[in-house]
A protein has these predicted regions:
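Alpha-helical scaffold/interaction cores of sigma-54-like transcription cofactors
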Residues: 1-274
Length: 274
């Protein structure tokens, strides 16, 4: 941590960051300043809701502007953090992605506070939906139940499915391979072929949408009524969410803001109140 600093260092850094914002804004023909102003207001509302707010997350902490407008609580120059290309760069003309943390127990309170404020100035805020799909193993289990195949057989088949970096191979990769990257799993293929129709049924089930949820952090914030930009639907808990998932909804011209929750902030707050 640097104890000494000079004003020119801060001005030069800020000039570089503002130049980057203007350059990208010109390239996409949209004022990126709106994003930073809105994000700053959301952080203010988190504090107003009585929640602690995380000091920073990810590469957003390397931007001096974020610190100056209270999005983050870390001085990147004092901490000797360079303004990195990962956060935003003219070669990638798009909006940055700032993640802000609040207390997990205050998630609903924070969301309602944000929604109340933006509704009051003629805007709208809505949670983003997520679609859960049948994975490789769950597709096999669903198909096995439908064909009345012994559960031990299905468990044996699922045990042969490789997992790379947290992701299971697809059924197609297990059965057919994937060019030069993945060879078919001979034992898997021989075992699944013993049960007529299992491979075809499981392969058709894999990837189907089977459940609806709420995005862990994403909210859509718009001017005017959200219905002008998309449509609503309800989760099983009667919560209003977007009818499209994040990527499809962004294609409709809206922008997602990330408000995450961290249980550690709850515990810190409890200690401070003790």
């Amino acid at each position: 941590y640097k104890d000494e600093w000079d004003i020119d260092t801060y001005f030069n850094r800020l000039e570089e960051e503002l130049w980057t914002i203007k350059t990208i804004s010109d390239n996409i023909n949209q004022p990126m300043s709106d994003y930073f102003i809105t994000m700053s207001k959301m952080v203010d509302l988190m504090w107003d809701a009585g929640s602690l707010v995380g000091p920073s997350r990810g590469s957003a902490g390397a931007m001096l502007l974020n610190y100056l407008i209270d999005i983050t609580q870390m001085d990147p120059i004092a901490l000797d953090l360079p303004f990195v290309w990962r956060f935003m760069h003219p070669s990638r003309p798009d909006y940055p992605d700032i993640d802000v943390d609040s207390e997990s127990d205050k998630r609903a309170l924070v969301f309602n506070k944000v929604k109340e404020y933006f509704n009051g100035i003629g805007g709208d805020v809505v949670n983003v939906c997520t679609f859960g799909t049948e994975g490789t193993k769950s597709a096999l289990k669903t198909a096995g139940r439908g064909l009345n195949i012994d559960e031990d057989v299905i468990n044996y088949l699922t045990s042969m499915i490789p997992n790379e970096r947290g992701f299971d191979w697809s059924l197609s990769d297990c059965y057919n391979g994937n060019g030069e990257d993945r060879a078919p799993i001979k034992a898997f293929k021989e075992e699944i072929d013993k049960h007529k129709g299992l491979w075809a049924l499981a392969n058709n089930i894999e990837g189907l949408v089977t459940r609806l949820g709420v995005h862990a952090s994403g909210v859509i914030c718009v001017n005017g009524d959200f219905i002008e930009h998309g449509s609503y639907m309800k989760t099983t808990k009667e919560q209003l969410v977007t009818a499209f998932d994040l990527h499809d909804q962004e294609e409709c011209g809206v922008l997602k803001y990330d408000m995450l929750t961290v249980s550690a902030l709850d515990r810190i707050h409890q200690c401070l109140n003790y």
